[in-house]
């Protein structure tokens, strides 16, 4: 076998003309030799990392993420596996797309993956991470989460707001009756319902159109922009030297504007509450802001929070309680309209339990509505409000399923793909609520086949609050009305296109015609 070095030496000695060529070839050979040696040296290290698709310089795998990230990641993970390592710019990103892998992250190694990645969007809109959802894992997060779990979203507190949910559902039913036989924008109605419930529970009054005057109209617009921005990606978070783009594309200016408008609005509401702080009454009738201001005054509470923390927590209630809740309602009704068999079965259950009562169905009536709960679970399986959940981040190096995961790796858990896994569900793309009858699977974070609200330390603390709104609203609208699509369209004609962003609701509003049943 020829020795390349000997060949080069012979060429060098044979002719002075060939000397430059010899040195060039030698240099190329040495570079190739070093590259080969380096790659073989690190083969063992690389083999212990999760599988990765090829990436580009600077942007990494960002070019492979389309308009619908959860769908793009599904296609990639089908080729590379349920634990897949990507790079968004310079940031390592672990994509988790199976129930088994999610269990490893959210249960076995939950503490390691309990942090949140930094985000320019969250930093500016949520008071520099002073809320619960985006706060870094640590003592502050433990304190404010404890406030939410024990004081705002406990079972007793959620029950205490039952009258608010029933009253606002009754108002929605009246509005539907007033427009019966006409085309209704159900998406808009669900947005208003959830906004009104959250406003009354969190702030003590409604701020919807016609209720809060000019301030109500402005708040509705600001809240819409707030939700849109939470689902926006700032490229500078992944490619730092492109941070200047937010000043060119207007994102930075829009963030500053919306953050200031929200802050001004909440400051006004806080001042109104403080001016009436002497008001007495049953503790169960106090709104969230009343409770937070009272905790702020209690120096003996052991959980000191300042005014900024109060505002951050209140904003969390809107971020988690409006867009995600109305999205679940919207998709449930969409699937019912697409599947008349399921709609009829649900109506038969509800009407069989409640009868011909014309007043609003109450939460006491929901206890025996097992098919209603199955419809809700099936909706969340196919349409989790946040398909990739809120990202997590590893705090240290850790081994997961034999792979080495480095500290500061972002983690995206695809609740959307897990819910469509054919290994877990028969005919996963079909809407069949019967699969959840008598099988015990729930959405509260213990069953990793269904985790629309996450699991572990960072599980959404408002699950019970959100589902209480969903169930009473859905039960009432299928009980009181028969439904049809406009222009005698069939269920197959419904456009199922999703929006892009943090939550995935329908891109086009859901419109239907209601016919009073009684």
Swiss-Prot record:
The lineage of its organism: Eukaryota, Viridiplantae, Streptophyta, Embryophyta, Tracheophyta. This is Cytochrome P450 736A117. It comes from Prunus mume (Japanese apricot). Keywords: Glycoprotein, Heme, Iron, Membrane, Metal-binding, Monooxygenase, Oxidoreductase, Transmembrane, Transmembrane helix. It is an enzyme of class 1 (oxidoreductase). One of its GO terms (cellular component) is membrane. Its main location: membrane. It holds the Pfam family p450. Glycans are attached at residues 12, 185, 275, 356. Belongs to the cytochrome P450 family. It is a single-pass membrane protein. The gene is CYP736A117. Expressed at similar levels in fruit kernel, seedlings, leaves, stems and buds. The chain crosses the membrane at residues 17-37. Heme binds at residue 460. It is found in: Membrane.
């Amino acid at each position: 076998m020829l020795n390349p070095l000997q060949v080069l030496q012979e060429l060098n000695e044979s002719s002075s003309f060939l000397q430059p060529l010899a040195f060039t070839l030698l240099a190329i050979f040495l570079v190739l030799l070093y590259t080969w040696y380096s790659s073989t040296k690190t083969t063992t290290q690389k083999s212990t990392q999760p599988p990765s698709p090829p990436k580009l310089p600077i942007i990494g795998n960002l070019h492979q993420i389309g308009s619908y990230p959860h769908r793009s990641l599904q296609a990639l993970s089908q080729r590379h596996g349920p634990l897949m390592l990507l790079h968004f710019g310079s940031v390592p990103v672990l994509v988790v797309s199976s129930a088994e892998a999610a269990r490893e992250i959210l249960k076995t190694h939950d503490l390691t993956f309990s942090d949140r990645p930094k985000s320019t969007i969250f930093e500016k809109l949520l008071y520099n991470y002073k809320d619960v959802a985006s706060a870094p894992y640590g003592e502050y997060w433990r304190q404010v989460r404890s406030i939410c779990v024990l004081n705002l979203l406990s079972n007793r507190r959620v029950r205490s707001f039952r009258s608010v949910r029933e009253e606002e559902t009754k108002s929605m039913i009246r509005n539907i009756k007033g427009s019966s036989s006409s085309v209704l924008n159900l998406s808009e109605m669900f947005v208003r319902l959830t906004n009104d419930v959250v406003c009354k529970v969190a702030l003590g009054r409604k701020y919807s159109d016609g209720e809060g005057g000019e301030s109500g109209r402005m708040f509705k617009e600001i809240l819409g922009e707030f939700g849109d921005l939470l689902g926006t990606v700032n490229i500078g978070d992944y490619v730092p030297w492109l941070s200047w783009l937010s000043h060119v594309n207007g994102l930075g200016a829009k963030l500053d504007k919306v953050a200031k408008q929200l802050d001004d609005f909440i400051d006004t509401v806080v001042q109104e509450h403080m001016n009436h702080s002497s008001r007495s009454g049953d503790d169960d009738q106090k709104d969230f802001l009343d409770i937070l201001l009272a905790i702020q005054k209690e120096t003996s509470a052991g959980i000191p929070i300042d005014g900024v923390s109060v505002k951050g927590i209140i904003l969390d209630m809107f971020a988690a309680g409006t867009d995600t809740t109305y999205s679940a309602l919207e998709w449930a009704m969409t699937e019912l309209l697409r599947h008349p068999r399921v709609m009829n079965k649900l109506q038969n259950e509800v009407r069989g339990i409640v009868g011909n009562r014309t007043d609003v169905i109450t939460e006491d009536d929901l206890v025996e509505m097992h098919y209603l709960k199955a419809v809700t679970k099936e909706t969340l399986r196919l349409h989790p409000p946040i398909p990739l959940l809120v990202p997590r981040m590893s705090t240290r190096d850790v081994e997961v399923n034999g792979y080495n995961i480095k500290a500061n790796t972002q983690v995206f858990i695809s609740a959307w793909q897990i819910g469509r896994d054919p290994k877990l569900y028969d005919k996963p793309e079909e809407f069949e609520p019967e699969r959840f009858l008598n099988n015990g699977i729930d959405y509260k974070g213990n069953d990793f086949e269904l985790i629309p609200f996450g699991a572990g330390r960072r599980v959404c603390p408002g699950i019970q609050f959100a589902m209480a709104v969903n169930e009473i609203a859905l039960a009432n609208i299928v009980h009181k009305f028969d439904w049809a699509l406009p222009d005698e369209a069939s269920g197959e004609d419904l456009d199922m296109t999703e929006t892009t962003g943090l939550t995935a609701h329908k891109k086009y509003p859901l419109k239907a015609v209601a016919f009073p049943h009684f």
